[in-house]
């Protein structure tokens, strides 16, 4: 048979199962056609691909097969093509059937050959079709992605997905050929290439260390290979035309394939050895199951490899070297290595990555046998621990997955402990710079494998300043120095340094040495020779580098701040370091000094003379360390001396070249050594640290002798070892004054040990200082480390009950006995490794201590927790913290917030509430100004003028931000924006570091307030003029806006002062928690996948409707503000175009905020999609969206028809807000099984956190099609509904954020919209909402109002449930049966069963345990479908909230409360008042002993039992709770009653709230007395009954209670009985 003359490509063939069937090369289309037609004769050849691949490659294959068939005139074979939709959704039973139908329709028979052209989905799906069609036909794999090339196409695994999981139905069916055309990768998006590199790295990690080492060094070359274009030239088809990069790429692919092919040949059906290719997949697949399809397979496996490496490290079978190398290699290719990676955190589903969820998914893994999870463990790079997956216990995996950990106190099992610490961070970073600058090769031993050294190495590689390789299994780093030659990175490439301060400071000067390149893409008039861009994370952008930059600029280097003055990021001009005299301020960081010293020998023009100025030099030992290391690398620095021999702070550095020593051993880290030594000290055991002794270069090596020995430890130190033996537990002694200037990083360890030191020496202290004092000085620089460490230690020690005092240069710690420390403390670690490790020392003796951010130790001791367990012998368990927002935050969530606004706007009031709600510190800048200057602002302005005041004000703001970079709210003076310097400072802060909030208030209210205010300086002009001048500046510098409502509109609607104040507090707390992302106000029901609704408001003006909002929102989870329907005239909007003003929308939004705490859905609906907003007004629409972000709106509905760039920009700035990406088709043309809806969904899924697609139902079948579509698209919450009457069924069946209306609304927002009541009724009628039975247990209860309360609530929301009375005074078998019945929905419990019911429950809330009573039973579904019974107490919440809501004045440290009574209700009252934050609680009972006994059960509540109500030890109470029957109290002093006399002095405070727990009569003595006291508000017992019932109702139903209707029913009956 004649064949075409096909140019034979140069191939690499890989054997599998005894056949050379895997052919690898470039540009293979003609070769593939010829080979298939020649070697696989058939009547029909069918090529199947997807639409995405078809665009790039289908035409060339059609041409190749057409030509090949034409060259074979004797053949009658057909060549058919079939194109299917792309993506995982095609890999289904339906997708398989569609291909099979195509084959059958085209009369394909058993001799057909099927070709799969595409990625893994195509290969898996088409392979399974081939395996089953006609009982098996031949097929060919032609993978087009790197992932498919090296993984899914090799080995014969084929499968489809089902709703139960991926690849659950399939077969082993080997392809006849696998053709690997590496030229395909040129058309692959970089992310897809990187996705495949994860599998390549995995294969090398389990099998071949040499290949792994090559991958570590080859990332730039491999990216260059796929970045080149050879498609037009066919370059690479033959070796003669193949570039070096192409050869490398083909080598990488074939080597990876070769390993898998070898393993498959030995174990085709995956009985053991083939499990090895699943390294990273056990955990990776679990992550993928949650995040698919947004996060790719390789990205999930990359995270899985790191985590499974950590599992092996924890089990002691893999060193940190191995984990570090895997992490570095993955990062080199841009793969995520943690679930905290911003790309992962940006996915809404990432909130579902809980430990229990991942462990549950891991149960279903084909590698498992029995309950144990099977994980492939590495023993080193290139070698697995076993030749199969190894069984691992859940607690081991849990500890690795957990973000936090709990240290279990005890005596170290390893006592006496002998260990070494990781390599010194300080020496490791210096050695890397020196070896890179030097000539020759240097082998570094004991290098620290951590985040810090990784970013240093990555930066040096990007600068092409050195080459790195590994020897001895990764124990030795081989550095080939570049002799000081550095190259500008490509344009757009930034050197990202994370929070690595050492790397940032050293590299700042290194980058000045970069060679000039006027042709660089970075060259400009400002930087004619190009520049390097260095940056870091949010905290790094707060850490100072100003003194170093000032010194470099003064020496002629070009350095530019890009955001905040004095901090990264920087543009650093190329061209060299000039040299000569350099003056440097070294009182903040010795790293500035070392940075210049290290680079000075490479000065361009003259020798460097480095002169240190500005006061005492900090951390001199670290400068000495740098000098010693420079000498080792061949350059000796001379430090000048005075005539008397005193050393001066002047250094002469000659111009020279470093000569790399052949080997350099890095000392162990002395700062890290302090932790195990301190564990020995605090637990009374012995620890020896190797490689740290008197000969150490590091100042922290003196910690044991200078601190622990003085505290009472036995210390032995040789040149190379340090041994500490602690005294018996509890016998450490305070040491008075200790100067730690030479070992500043060790101060945190000293602080936690000092916290448990008893009375000792007061050496160096004043005579009146307590003898349990340890005063630590010389550590001021620790305020500008990874966090403000001095403040961090003070704040966290306070949680343990340890008292401290902050000093200018340090702090004092007042030690106390271990047993008196608070237990179960959760320590916030500030993402600071030293904070975490220091508190882990204290945790060894304080039970229940949780370290919230355990991974921050990876900066210097990545395996600290493993070593703490395995080497020291203190157990650590993984803890999952309560979930916080996964949203991408522009800032560190704990970045300090600046408040700006006019004088009189309420900045101080709002700031104080905000700080209290976040648990942060509040600072009024004006008060700080007065404290520092000793003058009132008005006095200062009068004496020195406004200009001087503005300058001083600017400096104070800068100081406050430097001193308080996190967890602080700073309120500024109204005129701060008058200064251009301040405006630049505030704008830069808001762009890069943290929120700047503009507190707004109606201008007329401000004018009225300031007209009567005299304490502050006069403006010298009209206040209104000042306001209108500043107002645009406030908007310019701010990132967010908060409207300070005075409550005028609330008062007009009958709200009490207490309710107005409460609304302000609630909204302030919501706003600041939302914009920080610390506790976003998002719908829990939506997040948890439960049924949820939002109410669509259609009012043109909300203000008149404010009183109706609580009624309208019953049952809703959020409120939709239809911005396009707003109209300041109050007239309904009749149609487009309608563009409401920003100010009007802001006012409406704020009114809504102060009326309801529900999340807001901010919607601007265009005319084409059913609204009134013009489709062409994109600029105006995004101005409104920006307003929503500035006001902290929770959900923003964004139509995907707007321009993609605008949407992407909005998404990048959304913070904790979520985007509902929406599309509405009013025509009815969109079909739920068509291509258009898939296209719209894919677009919406890419940009939105929630997807909303609305169609129009023309028949009832359209609802079923929608249902099927929704079932297949579950990666994100999906709102899918059909409009019109025929579409109402879709609203009933939709579960996520169904838009609902209410009968009281003026119009419905869309045709067919239903109420919550309508939907519940329909669900019940369709069998989707089963009726449940609820009960009240207790006796006597015949006249209880609870049935009326709850049954009214069920009726109003259309719920088919019933609430019954079950009268009983004992727990009977019938009660036991009722609460375990399938229809049991929940129960209220009253006397006498509140305690007796507890043994029947599976779990009891902490508050119910503390109160000692359960009044509510809530059934909860477990993961396995069974039911657990949860008991809680809602009485305390009712007391808490009604007291809080009626307090006019906020709670301060001086606020007091009074509880009358000492029974069970009094316990709930005490718990509620303590939860309010009131620190002094008076307790009165007729029997004082009973009061004292009750007080003793709550020793931390600040309870003071009273003998009389006539006077109070402190301030009079502003909250009074009466837990005494009404008959037991009287206001008649001369009464013969045995009741408690209530004197008028009870209510002597000017305002307050009294809560009466007695149900009858309506007006009790205490309420009557309060009614006579101006400013006091009374809460009746019936109000408490209703309030606690609302919480029960919402806990049982998951729906917001229709409070107004429920309460109206109860009050009506109650009043009729009086």
From Swiss-Prot:
The active site is at residues 270, 285, 856, 1224, 1252. InterPro entries: Aldolase_TIM (IPR013785), Aminoacid_DH-like_N_sf (IPR046346), DHQ_synth_AroB (IPR016037), DHQS/DOIS_N (IPR030960), DHQS_C (IPR056179), DHquinase_I (IPR001381), Enolpyruvate_Tfrase_dom (IPR001986), Enolpyruvate_Tfrase_sf (IPR036968). CDD domains: DHQase_I, DHQS, EPSP_synthase, NAD_bind_Shikimate_DH, SK. Transmembrane segments: none annotated. Coiled coil: none annotated. Residues 894-1096 are annotated as: Shikimate kinase. Zn(2+) binds at residues 199, 281, 297. Homodimer. This is Pentafunctional AROM polypeptide. It comes from Thanatephorus cucumeris.
């Amino acid at each position: 048979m004649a064949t075409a003359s096909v140019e034979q490509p140069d191939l690499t063939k890989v054997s599998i199962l005894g056949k050379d069937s895997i052919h690898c090369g470039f540009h293979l289309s003609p070769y593939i056609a010829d080979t298939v037609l020649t070697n696989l004769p058939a009547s029909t050849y069918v090529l199947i691909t997807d639409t995405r691949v078809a665009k790039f490659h289908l035409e060339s294959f059609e041409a190749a097969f057409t030509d090949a068939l034409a060259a074979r005139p004797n053949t009658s074979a057909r060549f058919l093509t079939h194109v299917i939709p792309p993506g995982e959704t095609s890999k289904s039973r339906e997708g398989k059937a569609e291909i099979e139908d195509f084959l059958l329709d085209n009369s394909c028979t058993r001799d057909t050959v099927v070709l799969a052209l595409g990625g893994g989905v195509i290969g898996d799906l088409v392979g399974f079709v081939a395996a089953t069609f006609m009982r098996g036909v031949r097929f060919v794999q032609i993978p087009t992605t790197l992932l498919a090339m090296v993984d899914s196409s090799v080995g014969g695994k084929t499968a489809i997905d089902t709703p139960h999981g991926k690849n659950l139905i399939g077969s082993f069916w080997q392809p006849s050929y696998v053709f690997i055309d590496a030229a395909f990768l040129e058309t692959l998006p970089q992310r897809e290439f990187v996705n495949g590199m994860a599998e390549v790295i995995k294969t090398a990690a389990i099998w071949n260390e040499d290949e792994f080492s090559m991958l570590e060094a080859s990332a730039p070359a491999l990216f260059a290979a796929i970045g080149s274009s050879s498609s037009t030239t066919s370059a690479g088809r033959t070796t003669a035309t193949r570039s070096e990069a192409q050869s490398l790429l083909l080598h990488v692919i074939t080597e990876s394939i070769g390993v898998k092919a070898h393993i498959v040949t030995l174990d085709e059906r995956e009985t053991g050895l083939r499990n090895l290719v699943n390294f990273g997949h056990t955990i990776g697949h679990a992550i993928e199951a949650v995040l698919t399809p947004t996060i790719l397979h390789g990205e999930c496996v990359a995270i899985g490899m790191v985590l499974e490496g950590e599992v092996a490290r924890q089990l002691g079978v893999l060193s940190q070297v191995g984990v570090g190398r895997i992490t570095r290699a993955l990062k080199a290719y841009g793969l995520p290595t943690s679930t905290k990676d911003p790309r992962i955190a940006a996915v809404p589903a990432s909130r579902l990555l809980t430990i229990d969820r991942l462990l549950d998914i891991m149960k279903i893994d084909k590698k498992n046998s029995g309950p144990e999870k099977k994980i492939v463990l590495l023993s080193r790079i290139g070698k697995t621990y076993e030749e199969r997956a190894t069984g691992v216990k859940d607690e081991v995996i849990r500890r690795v997955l957990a973000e936090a950990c709990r240290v279990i106190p005890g005596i170290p099992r390893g006592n006496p402990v002998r260990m070494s610490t990781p390599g010194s961070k300080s020496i490791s970073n210096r050695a890397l710079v020196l070896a890179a600058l030097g000539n020759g090769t240097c082998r570094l031993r004991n290098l620290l494998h951590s985040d810090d050294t990784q970013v240093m190495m990555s930066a040096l590689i990007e600068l092409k300043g050195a080459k790195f390789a590994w020897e001895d299994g990764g124990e030795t780093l081989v550095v080939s120095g570049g002799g000081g030659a550095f190259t500008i990175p490509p344009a757009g490439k930034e050197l990202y340094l994370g929070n690595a301060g050492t790397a940032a400071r050293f590299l700042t000067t290194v980058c000045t040495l970069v060679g000039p390149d006027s042709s660089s893409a970075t060259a400009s008039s400002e930087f004619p020779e190009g520049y390097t861009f260095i940056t870091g994370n949010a905290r790094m952008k707060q850490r100072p580098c100003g003194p170093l930059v000032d010194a470099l600029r003064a020496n002629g280097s070009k350095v530019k701040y890009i955001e905040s003055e004095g901090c990264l990021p920087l543009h650093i001009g190329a061209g060299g370091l000039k040299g000569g005299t350099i003056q440097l301020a070294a009182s903040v960081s010795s790293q500035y000094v070392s940075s210049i010293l290290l680079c000075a020998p490479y000065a361009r023009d003259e020798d460097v003379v480095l002169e240190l100025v500005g006061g005492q030099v900090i951390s001199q030992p670290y400068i000495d360390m740098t000098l010693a290391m420079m000498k080792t690398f061949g350059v000796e620095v001379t430090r000048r001396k005075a005539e008397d021999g005193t050393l001066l702070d002047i250094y002469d550095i000659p111009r020279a070249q470093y000569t790399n020593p052949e080997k350099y051993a890095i000392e162990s880290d002395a700062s890290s050594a302090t932790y195990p030594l301190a564990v020995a000290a605090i637990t009374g055991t012995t620890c020896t640290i190797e490689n740290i002794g008197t000969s150490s270069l590091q100042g922290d090596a003196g910690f044991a002798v200078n601190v622990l020995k003085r505290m009472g430890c036995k210390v032995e130190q040789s040149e190379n070892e340090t041994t500490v033996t602690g005294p018996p537990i509890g016998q450490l002694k305070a040491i008075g004054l200790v100067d730690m200037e030479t070992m500043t990083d060790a101060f945190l360890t000293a602080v936690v040990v000092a916290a448990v030191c008893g009375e000792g020496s007061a050496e160096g202290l004043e005579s009146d200082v307590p003898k349990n004092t340890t005063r630590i000085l010389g550590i001021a620089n620790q305020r500008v480390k990874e966090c403000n460490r001095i403040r961090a230690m003070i704040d966290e020690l306070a949680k343990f009950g340890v008292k401290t005092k902050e000093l200018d240069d340090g702090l004092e710690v007042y030690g106390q006995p271990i047993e008196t420390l608070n237990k179960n403390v959760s320590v916030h670690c500030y993402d600071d490794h030293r904070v975490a490790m220091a508190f882990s020392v204290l945790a060894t003796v304080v039970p229940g201590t949780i370290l919230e951010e355990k991974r921050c130790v990876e900066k210097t001791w990545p395996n600290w927790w493993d070593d703490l367990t395995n080497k020291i012998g203190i157990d650590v368990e993984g803890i999952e913290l309560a979930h916080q927002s996964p949203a991408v935050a522009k800032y560190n969530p704990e970045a300090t917030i600046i408040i700006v606004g006019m004088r009189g706007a309420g900045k101080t009031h709002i700031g104080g509430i905000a700080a209290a709600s976040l648990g942060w510190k509040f600072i009024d800048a004006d008060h700080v100004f007065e404290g520092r200057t000793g003058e009132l602002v008005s006095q200062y302005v009068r004496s020195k003028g406004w200009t001087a005041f503005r300058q001083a004000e600017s400096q104070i703001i800068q100081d406050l931000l430097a001193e308080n970079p996190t967890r602080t709210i700073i309120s500024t003076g109204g005129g701060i924006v008058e200064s251009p310097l301040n405006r630049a400072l505030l704008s830069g802060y808001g762009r890069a570091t943290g929120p700047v909030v503009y507190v707004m208030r109606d201008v007329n209210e401000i004018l009225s307030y300031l007209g009567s205010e005299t304490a502050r300086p006069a403006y010298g002009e009209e206040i209104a003029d000042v306001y209108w001048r500043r107002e645009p500046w406030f908007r310019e510098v701010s990132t967010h806006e908060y409207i300070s409502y005075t409550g005028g509109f609330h008062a007009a609607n009958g709200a009490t002062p207490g309710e107005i104040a409460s609304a302000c507090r609630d909204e302030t707390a919501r706003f600041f928690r939302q914009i920080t992302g610390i506790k976003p106000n998002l719908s829990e029901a939506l997040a948890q996948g439960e049924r949820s609704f939002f109410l669509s408001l259609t009012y043109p003006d909300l203000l008149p409707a404010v009183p109706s909002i609580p009624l309208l929102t019953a049952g809703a989870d959020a409120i939709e503000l239809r911005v396009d329907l707003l109209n300041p005239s109050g007239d309904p909007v009749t149609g487009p175009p309608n563009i409401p003003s920003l100010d009007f929308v802001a006012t409406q939004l704020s009114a809504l905020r102060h009326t309801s705490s529900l999340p807001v859905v901010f919607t601007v609906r265009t005319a084409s999609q059913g609204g009134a907003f013009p489709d062409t007004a994109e600029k105006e629409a995004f101005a409104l969206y920006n307003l929503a972000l500035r006001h902290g709106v929770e959900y923003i509905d964004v139509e995907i028809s707007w321009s993609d760039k605008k949407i992407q920009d909005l998404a990048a700035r959304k913070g904790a807000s979520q985007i509902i990406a929406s599309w509405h088709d009013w025509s009815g043309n969109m079909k739920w099984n068509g291509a258009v809806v898939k296209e719209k969904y894919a677009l919406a899924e890419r940009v939105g956190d929630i997807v909303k697609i609305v169609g129009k139902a023309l028949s009832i079948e359209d609802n079923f099609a929608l249902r099927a579509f929704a079932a297949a698209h579950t990666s994100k919450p999906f709102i899918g509904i059909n409009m019109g009457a025929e579409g109402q069924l879709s609203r009933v069946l939709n579960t996520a954020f169904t838009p609902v209306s209410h009968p009281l609304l003026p119009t419905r927002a869309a045709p067919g919209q239903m109420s919550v009541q309508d939907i519940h009724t329909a669900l019940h009628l369709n069998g989707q909402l089963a009726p449940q039975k609820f009960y009240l247990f207790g006796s006597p209860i015949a006249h209880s109002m609870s049935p009326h309360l709850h049954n009214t609530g069920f009726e109003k929301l259309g719920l088919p449930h019933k609430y019954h009375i079950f009268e009983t005074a004992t727990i009977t078998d019938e009660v036991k049966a009722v609460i375990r019945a399938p229809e049991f929905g929940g129960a209220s419990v009253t006397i006498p069963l509140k305690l007796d019911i507890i043994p029947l429950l599976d779990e009891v809330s902490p508050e119910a345990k503390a109160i000692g009573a359960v009044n509510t039973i809530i059934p909860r579904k477990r993961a396995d479908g069974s039911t657990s019974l949860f008991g809680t107490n809602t009485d305390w919440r009712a007391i808490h909230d009604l007291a809080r809501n009626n307090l006019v004045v906020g709670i301060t440290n001086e606020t007091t409360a009074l509880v009358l009574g000492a029974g069970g209700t009094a316990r709930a009252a005490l718990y509620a008042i303590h939860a309010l934050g009131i620190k002094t609680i008076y307790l009165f009972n007729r029997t004082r002993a009973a009061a004292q006994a009750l007080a003793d059960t709550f020793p931390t509540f600040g309870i003071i039992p009273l003998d009389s109500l006539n006077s109070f030890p402190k301030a009079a109470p502003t909250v009074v709770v009466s837990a005494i029957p009404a008959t037991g109290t009287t206001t008649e002093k001369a009464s013969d009653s045995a009741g408690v006399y209530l004197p008028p002095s009870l209510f002597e405070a000017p305002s307050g709230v009294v809560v009466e727990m007695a149900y009858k009569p309506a007006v009790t003595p205490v309420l009557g007395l309060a009614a006579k006291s101006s400013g006091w508000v009374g809460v009746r017992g019936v109000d408490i009954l209703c309030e606690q019932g609302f919480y029960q109702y919402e806990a049982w139903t998951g729906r917001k209670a229709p409070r107004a209707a429920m309460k109206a029913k109860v009050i009506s009956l109650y009043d009729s009985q009086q």
